[in-house]
Amino acid sequence: MFLIPLGLLSLVLLATPGLANSPLTLRLTVQDHKVTASWQAPFPLSNYVLYYAPYPEMNPIQSVPLGELTRLSVELPYGAAYYVAVSGEDLYGQRHLSNITYFRIKKIWHPSPGTTWQWQLTDPIDLTVEAEMFDIDLFETPKEIIQALHQRGRIVICYFSAGTYEPWRPDAPLFPREIIGNPLKDWPEERWLDIRRLDLLAPLMEARLDLAVQKGCDGVEPDNVDAYQNKSGFPISDKDQLRYNRWLAQAAHQRGLSVGLKNDLDQIPELVDEFDWALNEECFSYEECEKLLPFIKAGKAVFGVEYELSREEFCPEANRMGFSFMKKHWELDAWQEPCW
């Protein structure tokens, strides 16, 4: 969940009496050491003020007058972490406050082709598997397991569904009914989400990303990011999907998290620069692995699994292409037959 924004909001309001919450929208992008903030409102504002406070302590709050600026870029060292908000003054002298967000400057994991990995979404996690990266469930995995993997020198990626409603998740009651659509073809308990409604969906996904930070995950695997190619129950376009997937990548990077593009092969040309690696299921079975090569050409790892083919049917070609593929059971337990 978002880390005590109401506490910071109260402090900002105390520091600036008469401040009103408003449609003023603040957006952050983080790339390496560089943080860029931009803001806009649906009505004229001026005399902007930037507020920032250390994350997660929230104190002290600092303010910087920005005049008419609506965009600001700064470079900060690794380890820097701040809450940020802006306010602006309308034609009647009323000051309006933006949303409050935060960022971390952290060295993001960028795996190169050939990186070894393990994918296990069941309990208990087998810590003895020899792999550089472990991809495990965000909700089900205790923080202590993540710490144990770190002690073994492993990178930990945390899985969650970014495009479907899962009724068994602890945050399921928070999902509004109006954004819950049709069931998935092979997973009838799951239902597609209306990814066009970022106003409702973004806070829920931000909370999951914040949980990943709290648990110590090095990155995230957002699943089900291809609703536009499925019967979701909503008129989701390819442009809607690109917007949502780009937002996910930016929100992860803003928190210092590595993020992978799961499947969504047809949008790789538009998204390869936004994501740090790719994860695919069964591209050899469907004869579509060539679509993943832009990640390899960009020096980024392509992780993948086959469920039905034998190793002999896909490993030689996977290795030739520079992919990190393995054979797995459908239930994604600890068992694996890697190609490396």
Regions found by a protein language model. Name each.
Residues P5-L14:
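Bacterial N-terminal signal peptides
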Residues T16-A20:
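Sec/Tat signal peptide C-region and signal peptidase I cleavage site
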Residues K106-W340:
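Glycan-processing catalytic domains of CAZymes
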Residues N47-G79, L91-N99:
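Recognizes extended acidic, P/S/T-rich segments that occur
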Residues N21-P44, Y78, L91-K106:
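Pro/Thr/Ser/Gly-rich low-complexity, intrinsically disordered linker/stalk tracts
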